[in-house]
Amino acid sequence: MAQQVQLSATVAESQLGQRLDQALAELFPDYSRSRIKEWILDSRVTVNGKKINKPKEKVLGGELVAIDAQIEEDARWAPQEIPLDIVYEDNDILVINKPRGLVVHPGAGNPDGTVLNALLHYYPEIMDVPRAGIVHRLDKDTTGLMVVAKTVPAQTRLVEALQAREITREYEAVAIGNMTAGGRVDEPISRHSTKRTHMAVHPMGKPATTHYRIMEHFRAHTRLRLRLETGRTHQIRVHMSHINHPLVGDQLYGGRPRPPKGASDSFIAILRGFDRQALHATMLRLYHPIRGIQMEWHAALPEDMVELINALKADTEEFKDQMDW
């Protein structure tokens, strides 16, 4: 069912000379400027009783503006009963701990069976929120924390916070090779020119920055803590591959098994059996979109990564007398 939106306000004198869409976005901060622009173009906005369909129209201050519009639900998406691990929930947001193998949003090759379909089952009212409240994504086989908006105002403010880089997202990962120090990868990312399922570092891509630090050294692998400044598709995976340290198990970006010399059969079996990128969204910190208080959540590593790290530790311990560090 569509959500009816009826709003009115008086343009402030201080807004003299602003574009109409800019002025309305300031007057009605619960709605994004792009949504307001769509309403203007669709003749859903009046100024002093007259319909205006030009977002660039300048305001003088003192005008009475009104919006009479609808937010349409998207009937393409069907509710599905899929288990969700809810870490936190209130009237405005919820935080989930996503398992491996679960796609976040329907798309090519995954028309259903996603986080979005599950959200519609447990929270039917979220149909009225753009993208069913999803404001950022994790790859299908990346595990960990995601925030979801339950209302339009919460969604608008979370999107703005992401764009302003006010939401902190930290990950744990296991990379191939011995890394000597932490650092930063500041390389633009775009879709690969020939492999449409891949992303790649490209000078004409969108800016992307990943910070990383070393948590633990193993014989031929490194455990990392990473922080995103931006949120490009496959960003951590692409950046780590770019610096020649792809993530264990990442078949798209060169993470094939590379057992160190002399490794035991059991260790090799664990390494070869790890069939997803070793990446987990372990910490999420943000200001609540409605209440304004800072909130932080943590998610422990999933069992498969714990098993992998324990195997790496055991292998390193076995060969510690032969290592130079």
From Swiss-Prot:
Gene3D superfamilies per record: 6.10.140.230, Pseudouridine synthase, RNA-binding S4 domain
Domain S4 RNA-binding: 18-91
GO molecular function ontology, one term from the record: 23S rRNA pseudouridine(1911/1915/1917) synthase activity
Localisation per UniProt entry: Cytoplasm
Keyword list, A-Z: Cytoplasm, Isomerase, RNA-binding, rRNA processing
Catalytic activities: uridine(1911/1915/1917) in 23S rRNA = pseudouridine(1911/1915/1917) in 23S rRNA
Enzyme Commission designation: 5.4.99.23
Active site residues per record: 139
Any one of the GO CC terms: cytoplasm
Alphabetical GO biological process terms: enzyme-directed rRNA pseudouridine synthesis
Region forming the signal peptide: none
Disulfide bond residue pairs: none
SMART domains in alphabetical order: S4
Key word Isomerase present: yes
Function: Responsible for synthesis of pseudouridine from uracil at positions 1911, 1915 and 1917 in 23S ribosomal RNA.
Cross-referenced PANTHER family: MITOCHONDRIAL RNA PSEUDOURIDINE SYNTHASE (PTHR21600), RIBOSOMAL LARGE SUBUNIT PSEUDOURIDINE SYNTHASE D (PTHR21600:SF44)
Family the UniProt entry places it in: Belongs to the pseudouridine synthase RluA family.
Protein name: Ribosomal large subunit pseudouridine synthase D
Source organism: Yersinia pestis
Gene from which the chain derives: rluD
